[in-house]
């Protein structure tokens, strides 16, 4: 039905204590047309040096996409095709970009951080 593609982002917290403000993701949800580019941003909990990206398609559990320690991308899933890229400059926030979106990209994209 139409050419709209729905990409959702949600919050996932690992190792947060009561004083932490939590992981922040932006945008929280995004609806786009096939063929467009989408960029998601994740701001981890302060002082957390590990950051993870996951995606969850309808009716499935979360699937690992990539893992950073500080700015180094230490592990990358085969699910990250040449249209997907992630970076974490200076070990701070992280971005996940999907180029030329396809119907199969419709999912909830999650980020998490830990010590």
Swiss-Prot record:
Taxonomy, superkingdom: Eukaryota
Listed GO biological process terms: adaptive immune response; cell surface receptor signaling pathway; immune response
CDD domains, alphabetized: IgV_TCR_beta (cd05899)
Keyword Protein transport assigned: no
Keywords: Adaptive immunity, Cell membrane, Disulfide bond, Glycoprotein, Immunity, Immunoglobulin domain, Membrane, Receptor, Signal, T cell receptor
Sugar-bearing residue positions: 37
Domain Ig-like stretches: 22-115
GO cellular component: plasma membrane; T cell receptor complex
Localization of this protein: Cell membrane
Disulfide bonds: 42-111
GO molecular function terms listed in the Swiss-Prot or TrEMBL record: MHC protein binding; peptide antigen binding
Subunit structure: Alpha-beta TR is a heterodimer composed of an alpha and beta chain; disulfide-linked. The alpha-beta TR is associated with the transmembrane signaling CD3 coreceptor proteins to form the TR-CD3 (TcR or TCR). The assembly of alpha-beta TR heterodimers with CD3 occurs in the endoplasmic reticulum where a single alpha-beta TR heterodimer associates with one CD3D-CD3E heterodimer, one CD3G-CD3E heterodimer and one CD247 homodimer forming a stable octameric structure. CD3D-CD3E and CD3G-CD3E heterodimers preferentially associate with TR alpha and TR beta chains, respectively. (Microbial infection) Interacts with Staphylococcus aureus enterotoxins A/entA and H/entH.
Primary role: V region of the variable domain of T cell receptor (TR) beta chain that participates in the antigen recognition. Alpha-beta T cell receptors are antigen specific receptors which are essential to the immune response and are present on the cell surface of T lymphocytes. Recognize peptide-major histocompatibility (MH) (pMH) complexes that are displayed by antigen presenting cells (APC), a prerequisite for efficient T cell adaptive immunity against pathogens.
UniProt-recorded name of the protein: T cell receptor beta variable 7-9
Source lineage: Eukaryota, Metazoa, Chordata, Craniata, Vertebrata
